[in-house]
Amino acid sequence: MNDELDTTLDLPGIELQHLLTDPDPTGTRPRRNLQPRNDPLESETLDDWLLTAALPAVENRAALVLEHLIQNTDRTVGARLAGEIARRYGDVGLPPGTIRVTLTGSAGQSFGAFCINGLHLTLIGEANDYVGKGMAGGEIVIRLPVNARYASNENFIAGNTLLYGATGGTFLAAGRVGERFAVRNCGGVAVVEGVGDHGCEYMTSGTIVVLGWTGRNFGAGMTGGVAFVYDRENKFDQRINPQLVRAERIANDADETRLRDLVRQHADATQSAWSRGLLEQ
């Protein structure tokens, strides 16, 4: 032990000799791990394929359309591509809709994480948790499967904690989403057809539209932004957390126009019969 180290008088019974002993007094052994990486034995991931396929378009700022199947073992799809766009162009990203990717199937966790300007992701199917986590721009759209015959507003299409920490971008989903939707949202825009408990928790800015059912404790810790909620059952006052937010009717033309534009955008992008029906009312 180094004799220069001070002694802590109130802990005289603690002996650190073995913890502080130099494991290699000769200095001949490596001080870092030199073993080969033990990566999983798996083929190229969907995210790898997406980055490779889109790289020339990113480099040349050229328009590109891609299609592929997706399954629930495909996690964080789009994150590497978003990272490459950010590395080259920073927060500005690419012009809107430069790279358009359509995926069909069930997406694994964190689909569209860190989405950025210029990246448009469309999922035909369903998604797990953390869709749009940390997204800063771009657009994520989730549509019903082609053969779906059920009512979108009565069924869940994505999991929990969507748009966690988003600072921008747009998220549109033809169905309900799970708990803690838009938690810590700070600038993202979203339209969904229902949310679970704790919606818009700790939200500081942005715009959220809920075209239907909401769970309990909505708006807990919410200090900014706007949420438009279709209170079909007239029970929203029982589900909102009144500590920091209040519920009120739309009282001006600007808010009404903004809401209608967002619902129309949702209907056009998701092909939702539910939002189309609301527009006709």
Predicted regions and their residues:
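Long, distal/terminal scaffolding or interaction modules
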Residues: 1-281
